[in-house]
Amino acid sequence: MSGVSVSPPGLISVVIPAYNAQQSLPATLDSLFSQTWPNIEIIVVDDGSTDNTAAVLASYGDRIRTVRQPNGGLPSARSTGVAAARGQLIALMDADDLCLPERLAVQARVLQQWTDVVLCCSDFNAFNEQGVVGLAYASHYYASIGRASKGVQSLLERVERMDLTGCLPASPVVAESDRQTTVYRGNAYRAIAHGNFVHPPTIMFRRELLDTVGTFDADAGSMCDWDWIARVAAVGQVAFVERPLLEYRLSATQMSSPRHRIKASTDTLRVAERICRRDEALYLAELPRFRADLGFFCADAADAEVDNDKWKAAQLLSRSVVRFGCVDALTLRVLLKILTPAWALAAKRHRRALHTA
């Protein structure tokens, strides 16, 4: 990344990939204009949008930097954005989420206060078209946190308290509980190798990190974030801010939604296998756990594929059982779907739709 001109310390570059985001972008950008951190560069990568995204971006003039490219998907758009960044700190964000006003200031303070931390993320609230879905939603969204006996504290061993003076928006009254936040930090590599719990739109890191781990790999597809985060966690500490710093939008268009499940589950399996190949020593040291991971990911991919291609689903399920020894309720459910005639499955789905209508 040494070929890019870098601004003096203090500038934070926020990188936002955007594809057909004309409806959500204005609120996303407005949330960044309201940040308590004063020195911000907003980079929006228009990833071949076919709606009015370009016109929306043009209306902001020089308040934002726009980079346009043919549609290349999330890995390409993220990589293009971080390559264009001039700030010493880089924050990731999606085109349909909202930053809380203190987000950038809080995360910058974490990276300034603990120099061994290479990546800072945070908890987040979730919302949809109907309103708030959940507060402090990370433990619900990420199984790694939800299953852990002490939540994030089970994954990151050090617990710190950090003062927020100067980070919060001006207010006549600030509750004592809001003056500080808990920050968990530590070596997250082993935990992340088994499944990501770092929410990509909440990430901030130092620009120099890109020289060590590179950018986002297109071969990882929709799971490029997990692949990249695992590489990051292998070289330094991860910090998790307990205070939610992002409002995360849940919608049918995002990659984590049911309509994209086939691609997401296939990409998850591919990245899990890649992580195992990349660190054979860790794979062998934790072989039973990795076998369970891969067996589940195969079965989950089979479940996603079964309505589309039963032969492919059968191959994935066979691999889950024969190669990884995974036999559980999911295995039996997928097997039943494979053996059930397509017309019977369609009739069952129709009855379910009528019942829920």
Where do the protein language model's features map onto the residues?
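A conserved hydrophobic helix/loop-capping motif in glycosyltransferases and polysaccharide synthases
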Residues: I12-S24, T28, Q35-T36, V45
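Acidic helix N-cap motif at the loop->helix transition within catalytic regions
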Residues: Q23-P26, D51-S59, L98, E102
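Conserved donor NDP-sugar-binding/catalytic core segment of glycosyltransferases
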Residues: E102-G166
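Short aromatic/hydrophobic "clamp" motif used to bind/position activated sugar donors
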Residues: I90
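Glycine-rich, basic loop-to-helix element that forms the pyrophosphate-binding segment
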Residues: Q69-A85, V106, Y137, N187
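Catalytic core of nucleotide-sugar-dependent glycosyltransferases
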Residues: Y141-G151, P244-A252, S257-L284, D307-G325
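Conserved nucleotide-sugar donor-binding catalytic segment
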Residues: A83, S122, G146-A264
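A conserved acidic beta->alpha catalytic loop
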Residues: S31, P38, D46-A55, D94
